[in-house]
Amino acid sequence: CGRGDNGGDGFVVARTLKQRGVETEVFVIGTISDIEGDARRNLEILGQIGMPVVEIADDQSWELHYSAISGFDIIVDAILGTGVKVPLVGLLQTLAADINGLAIPVVSVDLPTGLSADSHDVAGEAIEAALTVTMGAPKLPLVLPPAEIHGGDVIVADIGIPSEVISGLSGPQIALITREGVRGLI
């Protein structure tokens, strides 16, 4: 999990999985003390239910925990979301490359880490997800090449944003073709 809203969503995912009996480990990429807002509240809830959180603030701590992570059945990528504007560097770049090198399915929250919501280009390393659960509406890099290969299968989670709000946003509008939609045309 990251330190922003995407990480906060990841904390909610971790809590939900634990409550459903799934063995779950949480890693924060960055310094835990920097987490604020809703993400901080969701992190505190993890503490209240006894879920330990491991801080990975540098390359050394990543190397220390990499072997444990390489044994997981699945990885939830909730590191960076729609706020990414520049290519990954340093620890984040290393982490994305290492995760991509594992034969473990990755589920990304909103967008795979390393992709920018504003572009379908891939500027450097980005997580290659098997599945992306994106919030509210599809994002450009999930449906347009060359970035779309990083998103894997895409599920748009309805989070209660009225369609009038989405259609009123500036920029391109995207609609996913679904089986149900095509069925109505045949």
Question: Each predicted region: which residue ranges?
Answer:
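A cross-family phosphate/adenosyl-ligand binding-site feature
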Residues: C1-I75, L80, P87-G90
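YjeF_N-associated NAD(P)HX repair module
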Residues: G71-I186
